[in-house]
Amino acid sequence: MAEHAPHCTDLQKKILHHECPEHGLEYFLYDETVLAVLLRTAYKNNDIKFFTPSTFSQQLGYMNRPTGYDIPPHDHNPVSRNVEWTQETLFIRSGRVRLDLYAPGTRNHLGSCELLPGDVVLLAHGGHGFHMLEPSEMIEVKQGPYAGDMDKTRFVPQDGPLARSNAHE
């Protein structure tokens, strides 16, 4: 297992934090389940690369194309998809944000990671929460339409940073 990035703390032995050979790509796994895929602003590749398996209801990819490269005009065909779990992707536009990850089922705190401007994180499984370390802007993308209270269950963690403070939204 690779060394933890300096801005990922308290990962302990409960979560596998794996940095891929491509600098700037991090996977967070728990019991072989992908909790999150973090694409740091430093990530570079000379082609197109997708980081999520085809079983995910959201796909996270990266494209690096030269000047003059064309992506032919296209539209998308209707395809029936069954979405059981909401997966969301956050783009950090400004500020510093602490991401807290929680185990699927038990909701035990597994670790925290600092997100910086330009970082993109896909949250696939388990619980998560955020704490703004400074004024921050985030852009969120997830499946719609939003199902209101049916879409998420809020919880007060028994351990971790938010167990000792009041959770907001």
Q: Language model features by range: what are they?
A:
Residues 62-84:
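Conserved short histidine dyad/triad with adjacent acidic residue
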Residues 66, 92, 116, 123-124, ...:
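A short, compositionally biased micro-patch
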Residues 66-67, 85-103:
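Glycine- and acidic-residue-biased ligand/ion/polar-headgroup-sensing regions
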Residues 73, 99-100, 121-123, 127-133, ...:
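Short beta-strand His + acidic residue motifs that chelate non-heme Fe in jelly-roll/DSBH
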Residues 129-169:
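Double-stranded beta-helix
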